[in-house]
A protein has these predicted regions:
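Bacterial N-terminal signal peptides
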Residues: 7-16
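Surface-exposed, short loops/turns at beta-strand junctions within beta-sandwich domains
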Residues: 86-93
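Conserved structural position at the C-terminal beta-strand
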Residues: 98-100
């Protein structure tokens, strides 16, 4: 009888399995609920204290956990769409992982004396560019107006480059940090072909690796056609 009861218990446990604990999922493509804005993937940053800046879709989570190489290093409040926290990296390869609401996003960086990633000088002072937190970290005014609080104006000539004329410096520049000089989101030539045809499709007087788009063209504004220098 005892053997029969035991067999029945095993049968019932197999017939009615317990609810599985959902595993963490990686961010979906498109409009991810969690996003790391800085540092960039593959960036080389100084060893030690590193600032992690990110965005969380409003209503997703009230806080995030930031792991470094699998160990929890920091917890941060995710208030109205943004979070910021400092973690400590050891020399060599490091994996940053941000968790919230069952979702996970990772970023691989290298802590090295040879630095390739540059933060915006105001990165740790969100309020310098963003409105108060209760408004969801929106930019406090037109984007270029915020930039001109510190930077010289670049639109003073007759012809103004399209993104700058539209007041959006962030088409070409990352306001948090980047691996390129002047915090551009790509190399100088890479930026141009994001919108323009490849140079090989037009008539250029000279072909040389030493000559790039900005050798002849102004990226902001110019008094000559085609934004020539």
């Amino acid at each position: 009888m005892r053997a029969v009861l035991l067999a029945g218990a095993v049968f019932l446990s197999l017939s009615y399995p317990f609810a599985a604990v959902p595993a963490e999922r990686s961010n979906p493509a498109g409009n991810p609920p969690i996003e790391i804005l800085a540092p960039a993937e593959g960036a080389a940053v100084p060893p030690g204290k590193v600032l992690v800046i990110g965005r969380v879709k409003p209503g997703t989570a009230s806080g995030v956990e930031i792991d470094v190489n699998g160990a929890v290093h920091q917890k941060a409040i995710a208030s109205n769409g943004g979070f910021m926290a400092s973690v400590y990296l050891t020399r060599g390869r490091n994996v940053l992982s941000v968790h919230a609401d069952g979702m996970r996003v990772e970023r691989r960086v290298v802590a090295s004396e040879t630095v390739t990633y540059r933060y915006h000088p105001e990165a740790e002072k969100c309020a310098g560019c963003h409105a108060e937190v209760s408004r969801g970290y929106v930019v406090s005014g037109r984007k270029d107006t915020v930039c001109y609080q510190c930077h010289d104006r670049k639109d003073g000539k007759k012809l103004v480059h399209g993104p700058l004329g539209g007041g959006d410096c962030t088409t070409c520049h990352d306001p948090h940090g980047a691996m390129n000089p002047s915090l551009t989101v790509a190399s100088a030539e890479g930026l141009c072909v994001m919108c323009h045809d490849q140079p090989s499709s037009g008539k250029h007087l000279r072909e040389s690796r030493a000559v790039g788009c900005i050798t002849c063209h102004e990226p902001h504004s110019s008094g000559k056609e085609y934004l020539q220098k």
